[in-house]
């Protein structure tokens, strides 16, 4: 399995280097990337933490200005407060769907409720959850997509995620 990951990473890096010249020609002036991580399901603002309402309002603000917005999360979104723990992350996915997330990486805490619950959350999400290296043992198939490509205005973006071992 490790050899497959090394080959995938080498191919990804090779393609990335070939595309660098094209990226320099792209116009990024209208692109806004909103990134969250380690939100742990906080649906409202708390000390030092912006909630989903703030994230959603920020996205809507930029869209109203005609910006091309990409809203992504780097993981650890579905666990660690009473509401999301009670719903096993279901409420966090509902908030993220309502906020208009484009993609999410699997963090180590996405696995806290077990693989079956995570599979339910993946099905509920209106956005792809990504991980290039999580394989379901029973099927030997990937749990999620490894990458996704977005076109925002004149810019093409590829997102890929490699999960940290849990």
Predicted segments, located by residue:
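Acidic, metal/ion-coordinating pockets
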Residues: 25-163
């Amino acid at each position: 399995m490790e050899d497959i990951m090394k080959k995938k990473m080498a191919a990804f890096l090779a393609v990335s280097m070939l595309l660098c010249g094209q990226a320099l020609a792209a116009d990024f002036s209208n692109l806004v990337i909103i990134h969250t991580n380690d939100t742990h399901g906080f649906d409202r603002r708390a000390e030092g933490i912006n909630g989903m309402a703030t994230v959603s309002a920020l996205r809507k603000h930029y869209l109203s200005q005609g910006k091309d917005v990409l809203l992504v999360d780097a993981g650890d979104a579905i666990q660690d407060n009473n509401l999301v723990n009670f719903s096993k992350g279901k409420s966090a996915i509902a908030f993220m769907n309502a906020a208009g997330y484009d993609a999410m990486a699997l963090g180590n805490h996405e696995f806290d409720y077990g693989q079956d619950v995570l599979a339910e959350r993946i099905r509920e999400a209106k956005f792809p959850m990504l991980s290039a290296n999580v394989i379901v043992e029973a099927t030997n198939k990937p749990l999620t997509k490894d990458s996704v490509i977005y076109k925002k205005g004149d810019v093409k973006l590829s997102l890929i995620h490699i999960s940290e071992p849990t």
